[in-house]
Amino acid sequence: MRACDSNLRADVPDTPDPRRRRAIAWLGALPVALALPARAELLGYPSHPLRLVVPAAEGSVFDAVARALATQLQQQIGRLADVDDRPAANGMAAGDLVARAPADSHTLLLQQTTFVVQPALEPAPYDPLRDFQPVAMVATLPLFLAVDARLPITTVTELIAQAHGESVSVNCGSDIIGTWSHLVAEQFVRDYAFHAPHVAVRGEAGLVQQVLAGRMAACFACYPSLSTGVSSGQLRLLGVTGSARSSFAPTTPTLRETGLAGFDYSAWVGAFMPARTPKPLLIRAATEFRRALASSDVIATLRAGGFEPEWSASDALAQAVRRDANHWQGLIRQVDLRVDTGE
């Protein structure tokens, strides 16, 4: 034995003190003990049917997306997965139900970007940042800027120039104030300093019809609402929101590519659970959603609604929630948007 080895062991007794042995044994068992609750939660998950709550009416696009996801999840986990449509109170009834549900990961909320915006428009019974745990992002929703093809406008720059001269009307239309297309249009006219009052229309179909009829020059809408007009040559696509081109129209540049620096907004669709849901259960659910996005039926249903399938984990969705809440609530305060509650 070398001298240094001898010196290292000189003060260590051959037989450890019993108390020291017990302390070492307890410390060794601590990681296992801490892991047991999480493992126990996962062993029986899901222990009863899943409930996917949706802030939309039965038969709507969002309801169809939820049902496609629920069907696939049911096949994966071997448990019933129900869709619960709660469109009341502009969809806030859905959030209220999930916020009050047990934090056992069996009740989930399917929502999109406007979920974190709504409390700035009208009183909400929950806080989207504090009362929910993001699970996973499952899709994004790009919007296209489309113009009446009869107009001599082929670029976004030309549209903005004519809007400044008030020779064309760029809408801020929607059937409900605070919809995604409405918010993006408000951001557009604010960034490029021209006047565009809000026009009440019936959904995106009504919005597009205004452009086709020549009552508006342009609008923001998802691709399925525009596809017929584009294929018939009545509408011209100038650009798309988001950080990358859309697979719906890959030759259409992003608005950022056209020179609108920073205009890369894209809505997300994500799943949420009540606050205080244990992290292992969030991760397990996120994994199942990721598997579900490999389903051709889920992909087809998402794309039929204008959504691009895109999975991101809980942390990435949480970051998007905080970013969008800060940005869009700030815009709402700046332009003083309010939902008419009839009071």
Please tell me what each predicted stretch does.
Residues 1-34:
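N-terminal secretory signal peptides
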Residues 36-39:
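Sec/Tat signal peptide C-region and signal peptidase I cleavage site
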Residues 41-130, 194-217, 229, 311, ...:
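N-terminal (or domain-start) structured segment
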Residues 47-49, 190-192, 279-343:
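An extracytoplasmic/periplasmic, membrane-proximal ligand-sensing/linker region
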Residues 100-106, 120-206, 255, 268-301:
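Hinge/capping helix and adjacent helix->loop/strand transition within the periplasmic-binding protein
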Residues 113-123, 187-191, 218-252:
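A ligand-binding cleft/hinge motif common to bilobed small-molecule-binding domains
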Residues 140, 226-294, 340:
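C-terminal lobe and pocket-closing loops
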